[in-house]
Amino acid sequence: MLRLLRLALAFYGRTADPAERQGPQQQGLPQGDTQLTTVQGVVTSFCGDYGMIDESIYFSSDVVTGNVPLKVGQKVNVVVEEDKPHYGLRAIKVDVVPRHLYGAGPSDSGTRVLIGCVTSINEDNIYISNSIYFSIAIVSEDFVPYKGDLLEVEYSTEPGISNIKATSVKPIRCIHTEEVCITSVHGRNGVIDYTIFFTLDSVKLPDGYVPQVDDIVNVVMVESIQFCFIWRAISITPVHKSSSGFQDDGGLGRPKRERRSQSI
């Protein structure tokens, strides 16, 4: 139950750049302070009772009509609500498109894309489920996956062979955020701007720098399910250290920030 609560808070408490969250352009249906849109998309990830459509629309299993179990790759019709306070898109109704309307899809060999959540990591492999894993050697040296990270895995399959061969791995989203404040530090873990999780076990820091509360920093972060957060910092660079006497000017500890997309 606690895990489901964390997922719910993570998916539905999402914060992102408004420019990043623009969905397909369809006719909107105004309703109060919300904007309803009907689109067709593809399920790109599913974890527990929550998932993503087209990597941009979050949904929970209770909005799927007929309680039909969903799988990655299924086409769906979606009624989408714009969550203005969090600059996000949330599905309020999901209808599965009957498979006979769009065919069975290719069954031969070829390159495909899988969206998955890291469940565990050892010295050699990264697991995104109990049965799907790949070598850590194919991951870019600039990015070290961590448990909870959401990854886009490009892989190939061959007829008659049940396992997959991953050819590339990258985070599904990477954002660069400038001049944000470290709001808490507890042991080896901390939070930036109340929304971005970090751990000293997996973050790039300048030599000799130790993150402290009230430090103003630039951050590179990836989408990741971490407790009640959906962003994980993979790089932290100090702009103003709290020990230097920096004080905010009434901004309540939340300096103005600028976000832009950045690929890894």
Curated annotation (Swiss-Prot):
Tissue specificity field: Testis-specific. Expressed in spermatozoa (at protein level).
Entry's disease: Spermatogenic failure, X-linked, 7: A male infertility disorder characterized by a significant reduction in sperm count and motility, and aberrant sperm morphology with abnormalities of the head and flagella. Patient sperm show insufficient individualization, excessive residual cytoplasm, and defects in acrosome development.
Task: Tell me, in a sentence or two, what this protein's role is.
Answer: Plays a role in spermatogenesis, possibly acting in the regulation of the autophagy pathway.
Q: Spell out the protein name for this chain.
A: Cancer/testis antigen 55
Q: Name one GO biological process term.
A: spermatogenesis
Show the InterPro entries listed in the entry.
Answer: NA-bd_OB-fold, S1-like_RNA-bd_dom
Quaternary structure? Answer: Interacts with GABARAP; this interaction may be important for GABARAP protein stability. Isoform 1 interacts with LAMP2; this interaction may be important for LAMP2 protein stability.
This protein's GO CC annotations: acrosomal vesicle; cytoplasm; sperm flagellum
Read off the lineage from the record.
Answer: Eukaryota, Metazoa, Chordata, Craniata, Vertebrata
Q: Where is the composition biased (Basic residues)?
A: 254-264
Q: What gene is this protein translated from?
A: CT55
Carries keyword Cytoplasm?
A: yes
| Entry keywords, A to Z | Cell projection, Cilium, Cytoplasm, Cytoplasmic vesicle, Developmental protein, Disease variant, Flagellum
Q: Which residues form the signal peptide?
A: none
Q: One Pfam annotation, family name?
A: S1-like
Q: What is its main location?
A: cytoplasm
Which parts of this chain are annotated as the region Disordered?
242-264
Where does it localize? Cytoplasm; Cytoplasmic vesicle, Secretory vesicle, Acrosome; Cell projection, Cilium, Flagellum
